[in-house]
């Protein structure tokens, strides 16, 4: 797999540990807004359900950034029966604190340093620009990447092929020289696959690296190369 020149990484939960950082940022908001920490686990569970559903709508252009930001905490507060807190203010505090978190996915720094010496590394991420760039800067990741492509700026969130095509064109990268690495099968892998780019699926939570029947069906319909890894350090023998 050493014929590649450009490696495109997803950010959240591929190299920047979104799950833990999101949790830490939201927990930090609780005392500021007078929320009991005993409510946190249930609040976080409900919030994630609403947030995931709203982000799916956003990816399909079914909701605006402003409505997503406003609704995810208002819906959570309402379901929890909590009054007297403005969901927009809570959202702003959360967005201010989250990009300051610095937890990385295990092995991220270990693989990025040697990969950056051999390849041009780039980011393709869904998210809000004011947050994603700060994540990269505060975590020390920014130094490894030549280009960063944020869906909000391009107005085409993954898995839309437009964001992948835009990245290739901007980087002057050919499809056969490019590889997408990400944790989401639907967003990163199928998105890159449909854009004609090879992919590596980072799936640390799966019991093994085998593909499901539905995934194999997708692979058979496409001519790109797909691999699955369970540790970021598995990239080293594949790419170095």
Model-derived regions, located:
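Asp-based, Mg2+/Mn2+-dependent phosphohydrolase catalytic module
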Residues: 1-7, 113, 124, 128-240
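N-terminal helical cap/lid subdomain that shapes the substrate entry/recognition surface
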Residues: 2-11, 15-106
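A short alpha-helix capping/helix-coil boundary motif
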Residues: 50-54, 88-92, 110-112, 143-146, ...
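Short, conserved clusters of charged catalytic residues that mark active-site
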Residues: 106-107, 162
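Catalytic-core regions built around general acid/base machinery
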Residues: 107-118
């Amino acid at each position: 797999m050493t014929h590649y020149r450009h490696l495109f990484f997803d950010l959240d939960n591929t190299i920047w540990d979104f799950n833990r950082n999101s949790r830490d940022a939201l927990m930090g908001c609780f005392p500021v807004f007078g929320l009991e920490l005993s409510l946190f686990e249930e609040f976080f569970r409900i919030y994630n359900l609403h947030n995931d559903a709203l982000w799916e709508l956003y990816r399909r252009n079914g909701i605006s950034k402003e409505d997503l930001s406003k609704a995810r905490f208002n819906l959570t507060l309402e379901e929890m029966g909590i009054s007297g807190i403005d969901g927009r203010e809570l959202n702003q505090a959360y967005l201010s604190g989250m990009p300051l978190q610095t937890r990385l996915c295990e092995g991220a720094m270990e693989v990025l340093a040697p990969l950056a010496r051999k390849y041009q590394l780039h980011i393709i991420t869904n998210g809000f620009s004011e947050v994603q760039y700060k994540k990269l800067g505060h975590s020390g990741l920014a130094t490894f990447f030549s280009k960063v492509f944020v869906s909000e700026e391009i107005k085409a969130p993954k898995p839309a092929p437009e964001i992948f095509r835009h990245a290739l064109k901007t980087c002057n990268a050919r499809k056969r020289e490019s590889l997408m690495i990400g944790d989401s099968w639907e967003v990163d892998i199928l998105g890159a696959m449909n854009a004609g780019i090879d992919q590596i699926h980072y799936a640390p939570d799966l019991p093994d690296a085998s593909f499901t029947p539905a995934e194999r069906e997708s692979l058979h319909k496409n001519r790109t190369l797909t691999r699955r890894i369970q540790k970021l350090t598995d990239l080293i023998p594949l790419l170095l």
